[in-house]
Design a protein with these regions (language model features):
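Asp-based, Mg2+/Mn2+-dependent phosphohydrolase catalytic module
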Residues: 1-10, 102, 115-116, 120-224
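Hydrophobic residues in well-ordered beta-strands that form the structural core
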Residues: 22, 110-112, 188
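Short glycine/serine/threonine/alanine-rich loop segments
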Residues: 45, 74, 106, 161, ...
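Internal catalytic-core helix/loop-beta-alpha segment
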Residues: 101-109
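N-terminal helical cap/lid subdomain that shapes the substrate entry/recognition surface
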Residues: 2-14, 19-98, 117
Length: 224
């Protein structure tokens, strides 16, 4: 049986990258390279300048894509297809996580700033292809990414989620602020990353965990 503070929950919302698999896999390293290559081709610059542009867009717009769309009119599908064309050999299924998600009662969703095609490739690699009731990606957000509040409202509206009866699990602490403000229970996966811990305000974090598989196993009654 779930702990008392979680027994009313009927919707579980999970971030994808660095949340459903360990951050040490560092898939973003591969995606980062592809982003740089895309920007180099787009603006005709070297790798150093492309990295500066990319990080500036991420800082100022929430995602590199948002910056590219606003500044260059980039086709989001073209960009996402390009940058997510990576080898997923760095990640593998976690049997404890797979089993714990299967035991978890309520609806389960993936909420990602990535796109559907990439997310489904990752979930398949993790043995979680059939573990979720819905996937809310950057296309469904109309390219307004987390942590913009509109992204969370769109998620709840699309899937008829009551924030007061939901949990959000996320490695980027700042992405939990809007969730908490909507009334969700928030779970921060603290992976030791300086970037992920940015804006880690305890007022917006209900649970701080190190490993999602271990935590879910514990709350679903199998912490062996």
């Amino acid at each position: 049986m779930l702990p008392a503070p979680l027994r009313h929950v009927d919707a579980w919302i999970f971030d994808l990258d660095n949340s459903l698999y360990p951050a040490k896999a560092n898939l973003f390293e591969l995606i980062d390279v592809r982003m740089g290559q895309f920007i180099q081709q787009l603006v005709g610059c070297d790798a150093e300048e492309a990295r500066r542009v990319q990080k500036g867009y991420f800082r100022d717009h929430g995602t590199t894509l948002a910056g590219l769309m606003k500044t260059h009119g980039t086709d989001p599908r073209e960009f996402l297809d390009f940058v997510h064309d990576i080898d997923l050999a760095r990640i593998a299924a976690d049997p404890k996580l797979v089993a714990a998600l299967d035991r978890l009662s309520g609806r389960k969703f993936v909420f990602t700033n990535g796109d559907d095609a990439y997310a489904r490739r990752v979930l398949d690699r993790l043995g979680l292809a059939n573990a979720f009731d819905g996937l809310h990606d950057i296309h469904a957000m109309n390219y307004v990414p987390k942590p913009h509040p509109d992204a969370y409202r769109a998620l709840c509206d699309r899937w008829a989620i009551d924030p007061a009866r939901s949990v959000m699990v996320e490695d980027m602490a700042r992405n939990l602020h809007p969730a908490k403000q909507l009334g969700m229970i928030t779970v921060w996966i603290d992976n030791g990353s300086e970037q992920a811990s940015h804006e880690a305000d305890p007022a917006f974090i209900d649970y701080r965990i190190a490993d999602i598989g271990e935590w879910l196993a514990e709350i679903t009654g199998d912490a062996t």
